[in-house]
């Protein structure tokens, strides 16, 4: 077993830059369909199913590379991670368009993820939050809002 550990290749920064960051890009690099990709969750170890693999890419999350082993994050662990980060690293809350004052950027230029599922908010979702005066939270030096799917959990339709 020690012999195997000695022969494991370590990733250099150059190697990391060349590895795929999305499941779709990984499947393309391997020449297989996305449905055939079996990628374990970094947190729970379960393999992502096809829907979770598609959601992972839709959320614009990045694959995690440990040496030459790849990991992703399943739906349940995305929610758990979002909750943990919010509870541990919360910084501030602003309402609606005040996010522009707090960040010094236009709403069009601010990267915002969902506070519940970690999806990357598109411009329609960001403008919807601004128009409704919904809160944006700064967590771990990044902005969080609410995506169109998760807002239904809050009965905000």
Swiss-Prot record:
What does the record give as the function of this protein?
Plays a major role in the induction and maintenance of cellular transformation. E6 associates with host UBE3A/E6-AP ubiquitin-protein ligase and modulates its activity. Protects host keratinocytes from apoptosis by mediating the degradation of host BAK1. May also inhibit host immune response.
- unnamed zinc-finger residues: 41-77, 114-150
* Gene Ontology MF terms: DNA binding; zinc ion binding
Report the subcellular localization.
Answer: Host cytoplasm; Host nucleus
Q: Name one GO cellular component term.
A: host cell cytoplasm
**Major place of residence:** host cell
- In its UniProt record, which GO terms are filed under biological process? DNA-templated transcription; regulation of DNA-templated transcription; symbiont-mediated perturbation of host apoptosis; symbiont-mediated perturbation of host ubiquitin-like protein modification; symbiont-mediated suppression of host innate immune response; symbiont-mediated suppression of host type I interferon-mediated signaling pathway
Q: Which UniProt keywords apply?
A: Activator, DNA-binding, Early protein, Host cytoplasm, Host nucleus, Host-virus interaction, Inhibition of host innate immune response by virus, Metal-binding, Modulation of host cell apoptosis by virus, Transcription, Transcription regulation, Viral immunoevasion, Zinc, Zinc-finger
Task: Write down the Gene3D superfamilies for this protein, in alphabetical order.
Answer: E6 early regulatory protein
* InterPro entries assigned: E6 (IPR001334), E6_sf (IPR038575)
Q: How does it assemble?
A: Forms homodimers. Interacts with ubiquitin-protein ligase UBE3A/E6-AP; this interaction stimulates UBE3A ubiquitin activity. Interacts with host BAK1.
Q: Which domain of life is it from?
A: Viruses
Q: Matching SUPFAM superfamilies, A to Z?
A: E6 C-terminal domain-like (SSF161229)
| Record-given protein name | Protein E6
Record-annotated membrane-spanning stretches: none
Name of a matching Pfam family: E6
As for family, the record states: Belongs to the papillomaviridae E6 protein family.
């Amino acid at each position: 077993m020690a012999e195997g550990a000695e022969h494991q290749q370590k990733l250099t920064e150059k190697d990391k830059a060349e590895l795929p960051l999305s499941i779709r890009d990984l499947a393309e690099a391997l020449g297989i369909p996305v449905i055939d990709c079996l990628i374990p969750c970094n947190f729970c170890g379960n393999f992502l199913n096809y829907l979770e693999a598609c959601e992972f890419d839709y959320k614009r999350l990045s694959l995690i590379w440990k040496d030459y082993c790849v990991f992703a994050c399943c739906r349940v662990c995305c929610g758990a991670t979002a909750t943990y980060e919010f509870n541990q690293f919360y910084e501030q809350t602003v309402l609606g368009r005040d996010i522009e004052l707090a960040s010094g950027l236009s709403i069009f230029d601010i990267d915002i993820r969902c506070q519940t599922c970690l999806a990357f908010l598109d411009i329609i979702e960001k403008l919807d939050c601004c128009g409704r005066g919904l809160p944006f939270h700064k967590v771990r030096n990044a902005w969080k809002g609410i995506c169109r799917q998760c807002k239904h959990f809050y009965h905000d339709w």
